[in-house]
Regions:
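Acidic, PIN/NYN-like endoribonuclease modules and their adjacent C-terminal/linker elements
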Residues: 1, 70, 102-135
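A general alpha-helix detector
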Residues: 8-9, 46-47, 83
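Short, well-structured N-terminal submotif of metal-dependent ribonuclease cores
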Residues: 1-38, 52-62, 119, 133-135
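Short, conserved active-site loops that position catalytic residues or coordinate cofactors/metal ions
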Residues: 40-45
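Active-site neighborhoods of divalent-metal-dependent phosphate/nucleic-acid chemistry enzymes
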Residues: 71-114
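Short beta-strand scaffold positions
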Residues: 4, 38-39, 75, 111
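Short, well-structured alpha-helical segments
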Residues: 61-65, 81-82
């Protein structure tokens, strides 16, 4: 199981070079392995907020709808928020990603911001690293 961080989705949706290629390849690989990938609830909101100015509301919604064909939203609750708040991560949003990853049983968090997750109990990997590992 893999939790996708917001930056991976934005790389694909906004075609952000040079990262779009690896992020798109990871999504394509996960599409062939349904229900192996998750996003957090707040990733959906963050994605929409950040993608809408470039893609527009309709295209941003369509991207998210297409994504839900093979990606699930991690089931989180109050206990997961408490867990996130207890983590020794400087950014609460990153801690919430870790809590969501734990809640869905993810083995990895797919992100370009690996350094932000150094103290995470769920290891972070770049899309390139995950492509190599999952091949």
């Amino acid at each position: 199981m893999i939790l996708l961080d917001t930056d991976v989705l934005l790389d694909v949706a906004l075609d952000r070079a040079p990262h779009a290629e690896a992020s798109a390849a990871l999504l394509e690989l996960l599409e062939r392995r349904p229900r192996m990938a998750f996003v957090s609830w707040h990733t959906v909101a963050n994605f929409f907020y950040l993608a809408r100015p470039s893609r527009g509301a309709q295209q941003s919604r369509e991207f998210l709808t297409d994504l839900t064909g093979f990606v699930s939203v991690a089931p989180t609750d109050t206990e997961d928020l408490r867990y996130a708040a207890s983590l020794a991560l400087p950014d609460l949003e990153d801690a919430m990603q870790v809590a969501a990853a734990r809640a869905c049983g993810a083995q990895y968090i797919a992100t370009r911001n690996v350094k932000d997750f150094r103290k995470s109990p769920v290891p972070a990997r770049t899309p390139e690293e995950l492509l190599e590992e999952l091949g």
